[in-house]
Amino acid sequence: GPKTKAACKMACKLATCGKKPGGWKCKLCELGCDAV
């Protein structure tokens, strides 16, 4: 659900997106969240 997706994106932000916002790992992580 939306809550899971939001939590997933928050985890992405903590893991990679916060350090490298445009990085491929960040994009891959968020794409994975959208697939959930």
From Swiss-Prot:
Keywords: Amidation, Antimicrobial, Disulfide bond, Oxidation, Secreted. GO terms for biological process: cytolysis in another organism; defense response to Gram-negative bacterium; defense response to Gram-positive bacterium. Disulfide bonds join C8-C33, C12-C29, C17-C26. The modification Valine amide is found at V36. It comes from the Eukaryota. Its main location: secreted. The modification Methionine sulfoxide is found at M10. Has antimicrobial activity against Gram-positive bacteria (C.glutamicum ATCC 13032 (MIC=0.4 uM), B.subtilis ATCC 23857 (MIC=0.4 uM) and S.aureus ATCC 9144 (MIC=6.3 uM)) and Gram-negative bacteria (E.coli ATCC 25922 (MIC=0.8 uM) and P.aeruginosa ATCC 27853 (MIC=1.6 uM)). This is Turgencin-A. It comes from Synoicum turgens (Colonial ascidian).
